[in-house]
């Protein structure tokens, strides 16, 4: 592991553009992904979502056909090397939010994506539908859009003490109430726990996925490799 300081012409960088650039320009900055997890820190270009400022973004892993994991990117290549990449397979963190109260939580969350975990809240085509979309049965799901609307109301109608108390609560898809503690949720919550199903997904990625720093990928033989750039799907998560 190490730290490398890179001088760039841009002060702010659009994280979506950086992570999806397939020209090879940013891929040239990578250390070997089969030996390191690359984490870039730079100031994200201005822009907010319904959840506020983007704190981090990560690429989502691949799994080969013979070890496909539902919800990941399928690839025909069981082994992929740095020379095959044209985009910067990595994690990006927003340096504007690089203070301790956020950075550790953000890095943990993005590492979860990097190792195959999805958000615990409902993600589908319709905001009105609440579904379990993270492929983990032991993580309660909830409608985040409903939560954000309620928090907007609570901010103007509850006392500060009441607001702090309710913001860590979620209402699950089946109507149950629970405290948010999972790393793969967004603020607000404790965000310091994984579940058994999430652990199983991460272990599957560590055992089978290319571009992960594991003993499997450190022992790649020349006969297993594809020469030159590969056209790979680029999927990012925040």
Feature names for model-found ranges:
Residues 6-20, 53-85, 139-171:
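Charged, glycine/proline-rich intrinsically disordered loops and linkers
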Residues 51-55, 125-126, 131, 150, ...:
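General "foldedness" signal
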Residues 9, 14, 21, 32, ...:
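Acidic-enriched, low-complexity/disordered segments with a strong bias for Aspartate over Glutamate
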Residues 1-37, 41-45, 207-214, 218-238:
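Propeptide-to-catalytic entry region of secreted or membrane-anchored zinc metalloproteases
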Residues 22, 34, 38, 73-76, ...:
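Detector for Asparagine
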Residues 89-193:
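The catalytic-center signature of Zn2+-dependent metalloproteases
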Residues 22-122:
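Active-site-proximal segment of zinc-dependent metalloprotease catalytic domains
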Residues 163-238:
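Extracellular low-complexity, Gly/Ser/Thr-rich intrinsically disordered linkers
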């Amino acid at each position: 592991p190490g730290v490398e300081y890179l001088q760039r012409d841009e002060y702010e960088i659009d994280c979506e553009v950086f992570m999806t650039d397939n020209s090879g320009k940013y891929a040239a900055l990578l250390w070997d992904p089969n030996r390191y997890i690359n984490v870039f820190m730079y100031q994200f270009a201005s822009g907010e979502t319904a959840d506020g400022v983007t704190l981090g973004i990560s690429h989502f892993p691949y799994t080969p056909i013979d070890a496909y994991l539902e919800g990941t990117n399928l690839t025909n290549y069981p082994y992929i090397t740095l020379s095959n990449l044209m985009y910067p397979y990595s994690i990006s963190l927003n340096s504007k939010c690089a203070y301790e109260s956020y950075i550790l939580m953000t890095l943990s969350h993005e590492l979860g994506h990097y190792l195959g975990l999805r958000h615990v809240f409902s993600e589908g085509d319709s905001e009105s539908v609440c579904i379990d979309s993270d492929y983990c049965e032991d993580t309660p799901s909830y409608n985040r859009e409903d939560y954000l609307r309620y928090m907007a109301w609570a901010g103007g109608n509850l006392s500060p003490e009441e607001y702090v108390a309710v913001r860590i609560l979620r209402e699950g898809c089946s109507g149950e109430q629970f405290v948010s503690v999972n790393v793969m949720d967004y603020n607000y919550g404790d965000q310091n726990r994984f579940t058994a199903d999430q652990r199983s997904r991460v272990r599957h990625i560590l055992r089978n996925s290319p571009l992960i720093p594991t003993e499997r990928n450190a022992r790649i033989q020349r006969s297993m490799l594809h020469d030159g750039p590969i056209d790979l799907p680029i999927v990012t998560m925040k």
